[in-house]
């Protein structure tokens, strides 16, 4: 079953699904600044574009481009800066 979600006045959209009992979502972010909260740990992979992020444990902003990924702890939040339309894959760990 697919679950379609929209955030930040439709500037971030995702489609969620399950694979082998693991929750996954794939989506697109339009340019902007966003703050996301996490319930579970997440692995975010950038499919195309770039995400500049700052987790609560990061001293500085870090940019991840196409083909790169990063992890975020559960029960935390992270800030995201998007300068170009970016597609991502999120795996909930």
From Swiss-Prot:
Reactions accelerated catalytically: a purine D-ribonucleoside + phosphate = a purine nucleobase + alpha-D-ribose 1-phosphate; adenosine + phosphate = alpha-D-ribose 1-phosphate + adenine; cytidine + phosphate = cytosine + alpha-D-ribose 1-phosphate; guanosine + phosphate = alpha-D-ribose 1-phosphate + guanine
Disulfide bonds: none
Enzyme type, top EC level: transferase
GO CC, one annotated term: cytosol
One GO MF term attached to the UniProt entry: guanosine phosphorylase activity
Family: Belongs to the nucleoside phosphorylase PpnP family.
Record-given protein name: Pyrimidine/purine nucleoside phosphorylase
Cleavable signal peptide: none
């Amino acid at each position: 079953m697919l679950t379609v979600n929209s955030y930040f006045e439709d500037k971030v959209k995702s489609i969620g699904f399950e694979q082998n009992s693991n929750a996954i979502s794939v989506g697109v972010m339009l340019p902007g600044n966003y703050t996301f909260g996490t319930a579970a740990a997440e692995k975010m992979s950038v499919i195309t574009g770039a995400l500049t992020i700052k987790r609560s444990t990061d001293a500085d902003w870090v940019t991840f481009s196409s083909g790169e990924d990063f992890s975020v702890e559960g029960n935390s939040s992270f800030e995201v800066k998007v300068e170009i339309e970016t597609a991502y894959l999120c795996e909930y760990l």
